[in-house]
């Protein structure tokens, strides 16, 4: 059993800590800026081209720079003042949103879509810094025994931004136009920068010459690969999302199976995030200390069962309920993996390890959508999703069998 929490160790107590509250504010406002701009860009690009393929190029223009910059971003986070580096990253978001505002309103004399793609590429490079900076500063504003609760609140903030950002972007475009939406994205990035500018945190002292950049990046990769708990948790999450992602297929299910209009898409898209937020709030109040490995494996298995259930469901509200649990199980995985990342990473490697984790996450999200579409094309919509659910169950079983260190994990042992 865990020890009773003091007032400062409760979820509300953590929010009363100015450093942690400002760090969470930085995270959600940076996320809102990115998400509002991303939704507006999709509308902007399609309005200009009327070509669905151009929407796919938006994702490519963002993710390729992210993958190229992420390893170097982790190195810089580990060797430069993190708060100032975060402010530079926020200035990149501001510059991107300002350029897009100028293009949308005609202030900048650019024509065609390539300036928009260039701005999105800059966003991808900036995004490579956002999570490593958050994770590195997280460990400077909380004590180690507060990491589990803090990770739960961080997951709630992240999911809230994922839900509110696209919704707000759509509303702003609908009622005020693209220029207003981009301007609001600029304002959100300014608020994120202000949060970091006023954040009082003791930065780690860097003594001695820095290792060569590629040697340092390789050192971080070797650390992750050599840590069976960390690499097991990352791989488990990556393969479960890669094989069991159903969000990309929601429009097809609504059209072909559930026979619901576009308003149903908003409901179904919100359900996983709602489930994740609920479980994040619960785990912030009741953090896991014992049997975290078993809980993680059961959560992934539950995630797989939800994928199977969603694939077989032919009723809209049953599908919505299943997606709620789908998000809840995924939320458990996110919180446990985030806590492992914070507890098991040495201070001097937080940036590099967080960047590697970001590459795992982005790989599963981006490739998962491609995999889901390919399998649906080859096997049909329902068989592809059901098969993906069984594949997730297999991944959970194989991990439990092959990685007993992760299976027997108690988070208290890492503190």
Q: Where are the language model's segments positioned?
A:
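Intracellular juxtamembrane helix-capping segments at the cytosolic ends
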Residues: 41, 129-142, 332-345
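C-terminal transmembrane bundle of multi-pass solute transporters/carriers
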Residues: 68-72, 79, 83-95, 99, ...
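Short hydrophobic/alpha-helical segments at membrane-entry points of transmembrane helices
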Residues: 22-23, 111-119, 232, 317-323
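Cytoplasmic helix-loop-helix junction between adjacent transmembrane helices
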Residues: 119-160
């Amino acid at each position: 059993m865990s020890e009773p929490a003091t007032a400062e160790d409760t979820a509300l107590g953590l929010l009363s800590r100015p450093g942690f509250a400002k760090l969470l504010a930085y995270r959600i406002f940076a996320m809102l800026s990115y998400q509002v701009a991303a939704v507006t860009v999709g509308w902007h690009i399609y309005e200009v081209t009327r070509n669905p393929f151009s929407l796919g190029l938006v994702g490519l223009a963002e993710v390729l720079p992210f993958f190229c910059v992420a390893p170097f971003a982790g190195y810089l986070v580990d060797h430069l003042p993190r708060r100032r580096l975060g402010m530079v990253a926020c200035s990149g978001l501001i510059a991107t949103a300002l350029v897009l505002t100028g293009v949308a309103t005609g202030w900048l004399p650019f024509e065609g879509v390539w300036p928009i793609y260039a701005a999105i590429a800059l966003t991808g490079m900036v995004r490579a810094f956002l999570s490593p900076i958050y994770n590195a500063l997280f460990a400077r504003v909380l004590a180690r025994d507060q990491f589990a609760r803090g990770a739960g609140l961080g997951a709630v903030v992240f999911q809230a931004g994922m839900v509110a950002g696209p919704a707000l972007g759509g509303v702003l475009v609908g009622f005020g136009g693209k220029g207003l939406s981009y301007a609001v994205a600029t304002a959100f990035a300014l608020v994120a920068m202000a949060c970091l500018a006023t954040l009082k945190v003791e930065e780690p002292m860097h003594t001695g010459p820095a290792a060569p950049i590629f040697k340092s990046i390789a050192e971080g990769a070797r650390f992750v690969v050599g840590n069976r708990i960390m690499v097991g948790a990352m791989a488990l999450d990556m393969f479960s999302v890669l094989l069991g992602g159903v969000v990309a297929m929601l429009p097809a299910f609504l059209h072909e199976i559930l026979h619901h209009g576009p308003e149903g898409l908003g409901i179904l898209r919100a359900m996983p995030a709602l489930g994740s937020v609920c479980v994040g709030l619960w785990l912030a109040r009741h953090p896991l200390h014992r049997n975290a490995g078993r809980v993680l494996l059961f959560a992934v298995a539950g995630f797989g069962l939800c994928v199977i259930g969603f694939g077989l469901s032919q009723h809209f509200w049953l599908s919505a309920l299943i997606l709620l649990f789908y998000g809840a199980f995924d939320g458990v995985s996110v919180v446990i993996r985030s806590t492992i990342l914070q507890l098991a990473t040495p201070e001097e490697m937080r940036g590099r390890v967080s960047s590697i984790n970001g590459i795992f996450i982005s790989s599963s999200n981006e490739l998962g959508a491609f995999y889901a579409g390919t399998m649906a094309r080859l096997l049909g919509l329902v068989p592809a999703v059901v098969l993906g659910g069984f594949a997730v169950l297999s991944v959970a079983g194989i991990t439990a069998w092959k990685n007993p260190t992760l299976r027997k994990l108690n988070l208290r042992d890492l503190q």
